[in-house]
Amino acid sequence: MKKAIKFFMSLVVSLLFLISCGNRGNSGSSGNNDGNSTVNAKINWPTKIVTVTLPYNAGGDTDIYCRLMSRKLEEKFGQPFVVVNMTGGSGIIAAKTVMAERPDGYNILFNHTGASLVQEATGTADFSYTDDFTNVATVAQDNTYVLIAKSTRWSNLDEMIEEAKANPGQVRYSQVYGSVTHYICSRMEDTMGIELNKLDVGTGAAERLVAFMGDQVDLIAVNYINIEDYVERGDFVVLGVFSEERSPGMEEILTMKEQGYDVVSSKNYEVKFPKGTDQGIVDILSAAIKEITEDEEFTEQLRRYYAIPFYRDQETMNREDREEVARLKEYFE
């Protein structure tokens, strides 16, 4: 009996030893692979519907770029990426809603830096769009244009500035506090030596354009996608674009810098997860977005709306967005 027990125990020890050696061998071989690919190989994502929330109404620039990206992601992963338009609070309601979701990779916030970073810098948002989310990637970049109605009393930028100087606080400007329009207005006032009458006539571009066409404001700053038809019909006059260089396909429109006013503000369209999302999921989605920004069809689609593909990975987003918030905080102080 004792011999049988000893034999059995020896057999168990031998088996455990062989299993241990096998595990060490597997561990060693996996260590030769790339870190991200090893992690990603263990993650099956997505396996169900992914909700993509954006803080604006349907039909605007953010909505269009989000839907273009989401369609490409559906093609790649074979799962629905459902776009949800959630307005209110200049985007803060949508942001907080996504922030409160489980960090399981199935809830995404799609927004742009023209609003998020200004909100953070001015304290309009009581949270950080970088530190309180998990950044994934940037997908597109667009510029903002300032315009007047054809029927207005001015025909160019100089005439508007002349009247604004003669009548401080009388020229009406559509401003959404804590957005790119807020920053642009402040920079215009500083560089042009004017004071504008800043009016809140709506959050989204559609609402603000209705107010503009209803003569509630004299000046409005929006993406070209929102005004193309009106400009082509001659209803609106573009005074300039707030970019370092003239926009592709819009070379006839002067930058503000070319006209002597250093006002530059581009909008980067970003993808974020709730804080704490698995890095493997982040890497999978970031790699997919990088592929999308290199896709010819996607590039051509963006160009139709006078935007460009613009990829930044998580590390670059974190660094550059923090730097921009710090710069904006210093400016608004």
Describe each model-derived feature in a short phrase.
Residues 47-49, 190-192, 196, 279-333:
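An extracytoplasmic/periplasmic, membrane-proximal ligand-sensing/linker region
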Residues 100-106, 121-207, 256, 268-301:
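Hinge/capping helix and adjacent helix->loop/strand transition within the periplasmic-binding protein
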Residues 25-131, 177, 181, 192-219, ...:
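N-terminal (or domain-start) structured segment
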Residues 17-20:
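C-terminal motif of bacterial Sec signal peptides marking the signal peptidase cleavage site
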Residues 1-9:
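Bacterial N-terminal signal peptides that target proteins for export
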Residues 114-124, 186-191, 214, 219-252:
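A ligand-binding cleft/hinge motif common to bilobed small-molecule-binding domains
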Residues 226-294, 319, 323-326:
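C-terminal lobe and pocket-closing loops
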Residues 85, 102, 156, 215-216, ...:
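Conserved functional loop/turn residues at catalytic and ligand-binding sites
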